[in-house]
Amino acid sequence: MRLSRYFLPILKENPREAEIVSHRLMLRAGMIRQQGQGSFSWLPLGKRVLDKVCQIIREEQNRAGALEILMPTIQSADLWRESGRYNDYGKEMLRIKDRQDRDMLYGPTNEEMVTEIFRAYVKSYKDLPLNLYHIQWKFRDEVRPRFGVMRSREFLMKDAYSFDLDFEGARSAYNRMFVSYLRTFTRMGLQAIPMRADTGPIGGDLSHEFIILADTGESQVFCHRDYLSLAVPGANTDFANDGEIADIVKTWTTPYAATDEMHDEAAWEKVPESDKVSARGIEVGHIFHFGEKYSKPMGAKVTGPDGKDHFASGGSYGIGPSRLVAAIIEASHDENGIIWPDAVAPFDIGLINMKVGDADCDRVSEELNAAFTAAGKDVLYDDTDQRPGGKFATADLIGLPWQVIVGPRGVAAGEVEIKNRRTGERETLPIADAKKRFGVAA
């Protein structure tokens, strides 16, 4: 992609309304545009990151056996009345009427709708277990939306919902999602710690929030230092092996970890002082088992092997992709801008032509752009006539993992410079070696 043809509305000054780093950098880097209180448009650079975050989520949900669907944003109030939850969200839920004067709502969550789908089609234990997920925009009328997309009124959510015959099956489904979340956040370059948490208005009796430690976090969190070095399950994890998955969950839930709401001072006192970590944290995911909370009032029953009807035992598993983008920035930035982990970077390489119009610089830049692209790399080629200092500032601000710098002196010597955005290290390489560095075949 040529920067001269790309829509990247960079802001030179820090926006006054931005209270935290991620909000400031997302506005400055031209990732988002605020359209109203707690409402944002995602511009090309931001949308690329959001899409990559969603793709990782999809891959890990699919790996764990969940199946993707898509449910509508507008829901019938009747479903929520069935579950008895219509008034639980109060003014946070946007309520509307259609032209037939029927009560509708803009869904803040989807337990009722997915339960209606389940009860319509699933009648036997032979069709279980079942885990359905979707990625959809949600709306909650926050009293005080703030921190950009970190706490907005309209946001993107991945919601998964599991259905099983009994608690034993539901616990296995919960464990699979637990491990899936560990892998998901690690792939995005985040160190997420599962902490015992309250279930809130959704209800239930087993709940974990996945928290990343950050000074700008909204929650006070407490955990054992062991969490900072625990090994995350690999890509070869067998999600069909309930015993293996349960062992992983046990390892990740044995040390103490809790949000402020669930903090147990007596248990905390038993943790050695040298192992205590007390910090602010950002919630990036929430999973919980809610049993028959929705299946019972909504009549979602299946026939068991005993020939009797059983209310399905359910769980809900949420990740906010739009919030995750901000969380990644909070965890990975410096004074010059964003530092994207490779897996979610909008482009793999920022190719900088230091002297556009110089025949040799243009030739080498075009050659590298074509070679990197052919090798499967996403390249943002800065072919603008901006000054070199401005080009470097833009590249650092938007945080691409690698910068390949093409200048007159280097080209004359048959070389280019490569900069690692995370470490700041620079290396001068022959052009052929620079190609090999990024997977271009000789």
Swiss-Prot record:
One cellular component term from this protein's GO annotations in UniProt: cytosol
Gene3D superfamilies in alphabetical order: Anticodon-binding domain, Bira Bifunctional Protein, Domain 2
Record InterPro entries: aa-tRNA-synt_IIb (IPR002314), aa-tRNA-synth_II (IPR006195), aa-tRNA-synth_II/BPL/LPL (IPR045864), Anticodon-bd (IPR004154), Anticodon-bd_dom_sf (IPR036621), Pro-tRNA-ligase_IIa (IPR002316), Pro-tRNA-synth_IIa_bac-type (IPR004500), Pro-tRNA_synthetase (IPR050062)
Keyword presence, Protein biosynthesis: yes
Signal sequence, renumbered to the chain: none
Protein location: Cytoplasm
Catalytic activity: tRNA(Pro) + L-proline + ATP = L-prolyl-tRNA(Pro) + AMP + diphosphate
Alphabetical UniProt keywords: Aminoacyl-tRNA synthetase, ATP-binding, Cytoplasm, Ligase, Nucleotide-binding, Protein biosynthesis
A biological-process GO annotation: prolyl-tRNA aminoacylation
EC number: 6.1.1.15
GO molecular function, one term: proline-tRNA ligase activity
Primary localization class, coarse: cytoplasm
Function: Catalyzes the attachment of proline to tRNA(Pro) in a two-step reaction: proline is first activated by ATP to form Pro-AMP and then transferred to the acceptor end of tRNA(Pro).
Family (UniProt): Belongs to the class-II aminoacyl-tRNA synthetase family. ProS type 2 subfamily.
Assembly notes: Homodimer.
Protein name (record): Proline--tRNA ligase
